[in-house]
Amino acid sequence: MDSISTAILLLILALICLLLTTSSKGKGRLPPGPRALPFLGNLLQLRSQDMLTSLTKLSKEFGAVYTVYLGPRRVVVLSGYQAVKEALVDQAEEFSGRGDYPAFFNFTKGNGIAFSNGDRWKALRKYSLQILRNFGMGKRTIEERILEEGHFLLEELRKTQGKPFDPTFVVSRSVSNIICSVIFGSRFDYDDDRLLTIIHLINENFQIMSSPWGEMYNIFPNLLDWVPGPHRRLFKNYGRMKNLIARSVREHQASLDPNSPRDFIDCFLTKMAQEKQDPLSHFFMDTLLMTTHNLLFGGTETVGTTLRHAFRLLMKYPEVQVRVQEEIDRVVGRERLPTVEDRAEMPYTDAVIHEVQRFADIIPMSLPHRVTRDTNFRGFTIPRGTDVITLLNTVHYDPSQFLKPKEFNPEHFLDANMSFKKSPAFMPFSAGRRLCLGEALARMELFLYLTAILQSFSLQPLGAPEDIDLTPLSSGLGNVPRPYQLCVRAR
């Protein structure tokens, strides 16, 4: 192709992009925002190294609701508790769609529970929630599994004999085993290759998606498919995870008894068989594989990452750690492990866990939503199909909701009588129709794991508490904690 033809082609592409970015003007008044360039959108005003800060800065200029173009894709951004609550809670149905997120969607193709839409999403979510509840989510049966796994974790911590270690894989193996036992029917030994592979693939992909490479891939996926970089490992890892899950599914198929389902996979396979003759069924092999992947990812990374943040915070603020231990000793003692029933008598511990989740803010921007119809919102018109990013970080750090949002302060969740106090601006699991499916399980795990560990051990940093750096290693999809080591000393 000669230079003139190339120039003409580029001009045509630029005009198409310009038309796409301006085609909404006839559909009502979009929220304001910075002027966008063809193809690039607002890329020059955003820093891929710190997308969250860039988007938050724009909200100070254009308000709590504004429009930005991530490449050629139009996105409405919501900032602050009030705007996010009005969208996700007050207008839950309109904002219930799942927006474009190529780093996930190009793998799931809309077949998993996290990235499906419409009737498929509703069917998968309803049935998956039913299965999880049948296998004890939020009930005593799942609590018993967590307590059992807690015993194994405590034994692993004792083996460190007070020497420095990185808690990442020690914690992740235990946490992942909870969701694995629900999905696959049994827990793994801590040295099982399948468990170690699951954790490695999930941790690496979470770090890549939270990096500048992950941010850029979500803006220009078709372009970056041809560019070398760490983002290329995303889909290799996805493929390995899919093969691992498929292997387990084949094992389940060979021994399936529809009248006695052992786990999530058995239940899903039974549903597939029941609807095999229905060409419109949403239950087929790809939805099983992708939904299983979504549950493994959420059930492993969310709690594991939160606990790693919690350990650092408790070491940096040892007075908080001591106060939690005193409450554990007073309410539970040392003769048994804490249970969920104890939480009601432990307001300070409950407040600390909530404050860890607020302060660590492990999913600062949430996954994108999408409006399901033309939507009137705060005097603006958001066209159907528009993606919406909710800056959950600005909810958790909203000064109208938290007295000292930039400080780690458990009293954000305590009233004047030192009783636990809920906050409507507490949204670590998002809010509305896309609320995290495993919220109840995650909350139970965080309480039982943290109290069991602090009942038996004190967490000690390798240096001075004031030298602990709480800034994340990267901040994109998630706030990834920096690698660190600690010592656990038996109490």
Swiss-Prot record:
Heme binds at C436. Pfam families: p450. Its cofactor is heme. GO terms for molecular function: arachidonate epoxygenase activity; heme binding; iron ion binding; oxidoreductase activity, acting on paired donors, with incorporation or reduction of molecular oxygen, reduced flavin or flavoprotein as one donor, and incorporation of one atom of oxygen; oxygen binding. Signal peptide: none annotated. Its main location: endoplasmic reticulum. InterPro entries: Cyt_P450, Cyt_P450_CS, Cyt_P450_CYP2_fam, Cyt_P450_E_grp-I, Cyt_P450_sf, Cytochrome_P450_fam2. It catalyses: an organic molecule + reduced [NADPH--hemoprotein reductase] + O2 = an alcohol + oxidized [NADPH--hemoprotein reductase] + H2O + H(+). One of its GO terms (biological process) is epoxygenase P450 pathway. The keyword rRNA-binding does not apply. Its EC number is 1.14.14.1. SUPFAM superfamilies: Cytochrome P450. Belongs to the cytochrome P450 family. This is Cytochrome P450 2F3. The lineage of its organism: Eukaryota, Metazoa, Chordata, Craniata, Vertebrata.
